[in-house]
């Protein structure tokens, strides 16, 4: 919503930027004329008209007034003063040079009419350069019958500024701007704001321009991933305990810490300093340590001070006085020494050894001044500066006479070998490995996919956990993962999975109904087909039986003499010129109607002869085409009604060479 309002505001401002507004003002200071002007009227009424036109070399008083026009009120001629005020507003850029026309008119009526030029008293037409100013310019016009004194100026309307009244500026302090305006129309931003329209707040000094922003002056709001008063501190990864970041949501572990969230203590001695009383601390693992106490102290952290007098070191009745890391013995009369173990002697006894110098004391005792390298009440002890084991962590003590020097084991340093050298300081572990400091060495805990002392060697995580039973190994960020084949399970596919019984889903009722209807329909179709086939076979069988019976009745007639007419008629059924006969299979007999009138036998015989001739002719032509199909048609004959023979038709069929025997 705010964006829409801001857009509307900019459109409104743009419309004002293309608009100008001002007013031309004129005041008549005095007007005098001859008495003949008012034509003897006792109360002469006049008014003034101002016409502004564009700059013209020859000023034409005729309209139009291109820049505007204005009239004064009707005034009495003898009471003209500064009350005659005329204004001509304009809404364009002020050009600076105009043609000014001032006319004085006689008002015959209350109407300010300028149509009758006889009522015009005077006219001033001049060109003026008028600059925008609050100051009035004065001028005098001397005519033939009048004198006009006037002043004029051009000023801009409120919120318009500049030499042309074209600069719009209205002070405001709201969502659309926070500014005031100077005399020239320039926007002066209020404190805490900037921008062309003073809509951008000035953030807190030092606030990061890249990582911070503000919605009000003096604020500094951080973007995601940054924090701090000036938004110049990156936000660590959530849960990061002992780490830093250079970019948002990083967790770079400090020295001595490791792990994803830098919560694993790898250098307990450095981070916590648990050993007290100047004891030497040694890291022994993740979160563990060992304190090597100085003499006079004990306990896990060397926090317990040892009382050296508990062992009763003073002899011969001497009293023990406990001190820090030491004790003193107060010896009875006649004894001296560290532990009052030496009885009193004099220098005459030569008590000092190893070249010591004996010195008498007033109490009847003596003291020995020992040469360098010896000590003791009688200089009997050779100074062994290594006897106190000053070298820690297995360092070798070297007595050089005046002082002792420690030769440290590899991995330790310091005057007493008390400091364990941090072998992880050089960050030897590569590929994001975690370094654990040891004694004269270090151990790298490598991330997934790397191995070796310094985690430099890429390794296959699947080689450490092979998958069984044909499983496929994949490398996951958490470690190797096995994808088991069907029937196996487990982290390495080592377990056989019991088969799950499969329950056949119940068939839908609609499917059962559809299947039943389809089966019934198929059964009906098959039955109908069987009935039709049986009917066709019966019809065909009946036709064949009828033909066979007719042929048998013909062939089984009694044998006739060849010379008789009937014998010759029978011979017509034989194929001439060969041993073939027409069989019952190749014949089809059809009964035809016989003419009711009897014909003579000569006619009958003639027809039979014609029939035989036609057969002989046909048979002769077909001898060369034994394997081709032929049709032999015997035209129907008119037999006597009482005759015993009927006409015979030969059914077309492929003729093969066969021998037919028919008994007659």
Curated annotation (Swiss-Prot):
Cytoplasmic side, ranges: 533-664
Location in or out of the cell: Membrane
Principal localisation: membrane
Residue ranges constituting the DSL domain according to the UniProt record: 154-198
Annotated glycosylation sites: 173
A biological process from GO: ventral spinal cord interneuron differentiation
One GO MF term: PDZ domain binding
PROSITE patterns tied to this protein: ASX_HYDROXYL, DSL, EGF_1, EGF_2, EGF_3, EGF_CA
Post-translational modification comment from the UniProt entry: Ubiquitinated by mib, leading to its endocytosis and subsequent degradation.
Signal peptide coordinates: 1-20
Expression sites by tissue: Strongly expressed in the early retina, where it precedes other delta proteins. Also expressed in cranial ganglia, in sensory epithelia including ear and lateral line and in scattered epidermal cells. In the mesoderm, expression is visible by 50% epiboly; it is expressed subsequently in the tail bud, in stripes in the presomitic mesoderm and in the posterior half of each somite. Also expressed in notochord, blood vessels and pronephros. In contrast to other delta proteins, it is not expressed in the majority of nascent primary neurons.
InterPro entries per record: DSL, EGF-like_Ca-bd_dom, EGF-like_CS, EGF-like_dom, EGF-type_Asp/Asn_hydroxyl_site, EGF_Ca-bd_CS, Growth_fac_rcpt_cys_sf, Notch_ligand_N
TM annotation in the entry: 512-532
Record's function text: Acts as a ligand for Notch receptors and is involved in somitogenesis. Can activate Notch receptors. Required in somite segmentation to keep the oscillations of neighboring presomitic mesoderm cells synchronized.
Protein's name in the database: Delta-like protein C
Organism: Danio rerio
Origin organism lineage: Eukaryota, Metazoa, Chordata, Craniata, Vertebrata
């Amino acid at each position: 919503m705010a964006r829409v309002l801001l857009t509307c505001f900019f459109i409104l401002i743009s419309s004002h930027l293309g608009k100008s507004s001002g007013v031309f003002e004129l005041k008549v200071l005095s007007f005098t004329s001859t008495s003949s002007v008012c034509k003897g009227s006792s109360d002469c009424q006049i008014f003034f008209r101002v016409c502004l036109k564009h700059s013209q070399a020859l000023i034409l008083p005729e309209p139009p007034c291109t820049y505007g026009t204005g009239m004064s009120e009707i005034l009495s001629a003898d009471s003209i003063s500064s009350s005659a005020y005329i204004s001509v507003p304009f809404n364009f850029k002020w050009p600076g040079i105009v043609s000014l026309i001032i006319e004085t008119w006689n008002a015959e009526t209350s109407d300010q009419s300028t149509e009758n030029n006889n009522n015009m008293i005077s006219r001033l037409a001049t060109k003026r350069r008028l600059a925008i100013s609050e100051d009035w310019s004065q001028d005098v016009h001397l005519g033939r019958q009048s004198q006009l004194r006037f002043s004029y100026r051009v000023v801009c309307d409120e919120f318009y500024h500049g030499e042309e009244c074209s600069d719009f500026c209205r002070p405001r302090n709201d969502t659309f701007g926070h500014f005031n305006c100077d005399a020239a129309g320039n926007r002066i931003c209020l404190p805490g704001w900037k921008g062309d329209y003073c809509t951008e707040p000035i953030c807190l000094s030092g606030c990061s321009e890249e990582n911070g922003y503000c919605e009000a002056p003096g604020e500094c709001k951080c973007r995601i991933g940054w924090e701090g008063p000036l938004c110049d501190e990156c936000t660590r990864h959530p849960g990061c305990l002992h780490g830093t970041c250079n970019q948002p949501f990083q967790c770079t572990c400090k020295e001595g810490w490791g792990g994803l969230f830098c919560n694993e203590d790898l250098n307990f001695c450095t981070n916590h300093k648990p050993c007290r009383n100047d004891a030497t601390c040694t890291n022994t693992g993740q979160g563990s340590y060992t304190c090597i106490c100085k003499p006079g102290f004990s306990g896990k952290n060397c926090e317990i001070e040892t009382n050296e007098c508990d062992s009763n070191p003073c002899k011969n009745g001497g009293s023990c006085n406990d001190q820090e890391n030491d004790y003193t013995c107060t010896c009875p009369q006649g004894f001296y020494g560290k532990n009052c173990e030496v009885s009193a002697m004099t220098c005459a006894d030569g008590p000092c050894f190893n070249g010591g110098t004996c010195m008498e004391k007033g109490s009847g005792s003596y003291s020995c001044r020992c040469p360098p390298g010896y000590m003791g009440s009688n200089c009997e002890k050779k100074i062994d500066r290594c006897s106190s084991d000053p070298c820690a962590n297995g360092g070798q003590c070297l007595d050089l006479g005046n002082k002792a020097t420690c030769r440290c084991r590899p991995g330790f340093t310091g005057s007493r070998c008390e400091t364990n050298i941090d072998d992880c300081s050089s960050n030897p572990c590569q590929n994001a490995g975690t370094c654990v400091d040891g004694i004269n060495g270090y151990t790298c805990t490598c991330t997934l996919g790397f191995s070796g002392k310094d985690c430099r060697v890429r390794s296959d995580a699947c080689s450490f956990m092979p998958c069984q039973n044909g499983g496929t190994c994949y490398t996951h960020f958490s470690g190797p993962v096995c994808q088991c084949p069907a029937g196996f399970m487990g982290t390495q596919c080592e377990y056989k999975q019991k088969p799950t019984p499969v329950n056949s889903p119940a068939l839908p009722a609609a499917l059962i109904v559809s299947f039943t209807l389809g089966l019934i329909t198929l059964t009906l179709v098959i039955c109908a087909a069987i009935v039709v086939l049986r009917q066709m076979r019966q019809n065909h069988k009946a036709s064949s039986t009828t033909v066979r019976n007719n042929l048998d009745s013909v062939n089984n007639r009694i044998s006739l003499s060849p010379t008789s007419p009937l014998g010759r008629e029978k011979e017509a059924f034989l194929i001439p010129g060969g041993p073939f006969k027409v069989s019952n299979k190749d014949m089809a007999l059809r009964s035809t109607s016989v003419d009711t009138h009897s014909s003579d036998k000569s006619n009958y015989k003639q027809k039979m002869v014609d029939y035989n001739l036609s057969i002989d002719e046909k048979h002769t032509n077909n001898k060369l085409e034994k394997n081709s199909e032929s049709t032999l048609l015997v035209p129907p004959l008119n037999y006597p009604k009482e005759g015993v023979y009927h006409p015979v038709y030969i059914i077309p069929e492929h003729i093969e060479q066969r021998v037919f025997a028919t008994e007659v």
